[in-house]
A protein has these predicted regions:
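Hydrophobic core of transmembrane alpha-helices in multi-pass small-molecule transporters
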Residues: 24, 92, 104-123, 323-337
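Transmembrane alpha-helices of Major Facilitator/SLC transporters
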Residues: 61-64, 271-292
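Cytoplasmic helix-loop-helix junction between adjacent transmembrane helices
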Residues: 112-156
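Helix-loop junctions on the cytosolic side of multi-pass membrane transporters
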Residues: 181, 189-210, 406-417
Length: 455
């Protein structure tokens, strides 16, 4: 059915190809600095604690701008929002390089991080909303989850290439990956300008005086359709708790593993970050396989969360690089399980017309956890040791277990996995429910005609 639908609508194939191209190029550009960011900030003169103050400022920026940038995408258009993202991200990346050259200090880097967060929030949601709108307008009737799953494979490969390439470029100079990112983003802008147009969505002007009211309306919808529902609230709290540790742990692992290895080879950090991407993809595949035999999503959530807690504690206690490395990969593989399963659960409960708004609100709650976790664990890592911070942060993630347990006790159809036993395909690695289909009328559908963009 999918192949026939695509044959009847070649514009759908062009839209999907454009989505894969833009998502891949954007991720390739962004990932160029992910493996060296902490090393770059340390080399720029920031202390270990100050590095995470700057990173926490980024998390704060995502909380601050998530809803306003979503309003931009839902009014001025997805194309404008995406182009704004690329422009702001390229500029803020160059600002980082300039700040390092003048030894600007933590306050300036924190301001640069907030600007970088603005760039990313213009992107989140706009791309997916553009895809769904365009496919609906072209008459596409295929499964959206397959498109998103393949898109995740494309971005996963792009992350691998970006982090490894960034690590190798960092061997030359730690600023080179940042310059490369800005150059790549110029190419992304050119491609997006040519292929990305608002089809199936009519942009409209939003007077500045109406912006505050629009933001308040979106925030109220996020509370009413998200936070007010107990299972969604519990999942948001669990994500807030886990994000506080994982956002810190991702960047703290770079200097920590190099210290354990007793090496200053920047390329190692890039390869490790690429390994993180691979382990996350492996976690996605665990979902694909386990959902064929597992009847409840909360079973996967509880199992993965327990493994993550143990892995984080081992990572902090060991003094061996070769023990810490697989512990880190086990930790991030758990993210590949928890992320899509949690996402699928949420999508089963959120009305299609409120989906983007609630996802945006969910991102805000997680971002708030990222602010507190990075500042607190960053301070502990500097005062005691990075290993001690990994242990404390890992133990803190155990708090997600009773929250997932409470969700399990509530039951409901959202906890049921439509695996082979139900006569349907299992949940996709991307986390979109298998019943998500353009023009379908089943529970959990994505209604493209109403698709909105989360900031």
């Amino acid at each position: 059915m999918i192949a026939g639908a695509e044959a009847r609508a070649p514009e759908s194939r062009r839209t999907i190809a454009g989505y894969y191209t833009l998502a891949g190029l954007y991720t390739l550009s962004a990932a160029a600095i992910w493996g060296v960011n902490t090393l770059f900030l340390l080399d720029a003169g920031l202390s270990f604690f100050e590095v995470f103050v700057a990173n926490a400022a980024y998390s704060f920026g995502t909380v601050l701008f998530e809803v306003p940038t979503g309003v931009v995408a839902d009014t001025l258009g997805r194309r404008i929002s995406f182009l704004a993202s690329v422009t702001v991200l390229a500029a803020s990346t160059l600002v980082y390089v300039g700040l390092a050259e003048v030894d600007a200090g933590v306050v300036a880097f924190a301001a640069g991080s907030v600007l970088m967060a603005l760039g990313f929030t213009f992107y989140t949601g706009a791309m997916e909303a553009w895809l769904v709108d365009s496919l609906a307008a072209s008459g596409y009737v295929g499964l959206l989850d397959r498109v998103f799953a393949r898109g995740q494979q494309v971005t996963g490969a792009a992350m691998l290439a970006g982090t490894i390439g960034g690590g190798l470029l960092g061997q030359v100079d730690l600023s080179v990956p940042y310059l490369a990112r800005s150059a790549l983003l110029l190419a992304v802008f050119a491609v997006a300008f040519a292929v990305m147009h608002d089809v199936g969505f009519t942009p409209r002007r939003l007077p500045a005086r109406e912006l505050p009211a629009a933001i308040v309306t979106n925030a109220r919808a996020g509370v009413a359709f998200g936070w007010a529902q107990r299972p969604i609230r519990l999942l948001m709290l669990a994500a807030c708790l886990e994000t506080g540790f994982f956002m810190w742990g991702f960047y703290a692992s770079q200097p920590y593993l190099l210290d354990l290895l007793e090496s200053d080879a920047v390329w190692v950090a890039g390869v490790v970050t690429a390994g993180i991407a691979l382990s996350t993809i492996a976690g996605n595949q665990v979902v694909q396989v386990a959902s064929r035999f597992c009847g409840k999503r909360t079973t996967l959530l509880l199992s993965a969360a327990g493994v993550q807690t143990v892995a984080a504690v081992v990572l902090g206690l060991t003094e061996s690089f070769w023990v810490a490395l697989p512990a880190l990969f086990l930790l991030t593989a758990g993210l590949g399980v928890v992320g899509p399963v949690r996402q699928a659960y949420l999508h089963q409960l959120i009305p299609s017309e409120q989906r983007a708004t609630v996802v945006s609100f969910d991102s805000m709650v997680s971002g708030a956890g990222g602010v507190g976790g990075q500042v607190g664990l960053g301070a502990l890592g500097e005062a005691r040791s990075v290993g001690a911070a990994f242990v404390v942060g890992g133990l803190a993630t155990a708090g997600a277990l009773p929250l997932f347990g409470a969700v399990r006790r509530m039951g409901g159809s959202a906890d049921e996995i439509a695996g082979e036993r139900a006569g349907a395909e299992c949940s996709s690695p991307s986390g979109i429910p298998a019943v998500a289909m353009v023009e379908s009328t089943t529970v959990g559908e994505v209604a493209p005609s109403r698709a909105t963009a989360s900031g």
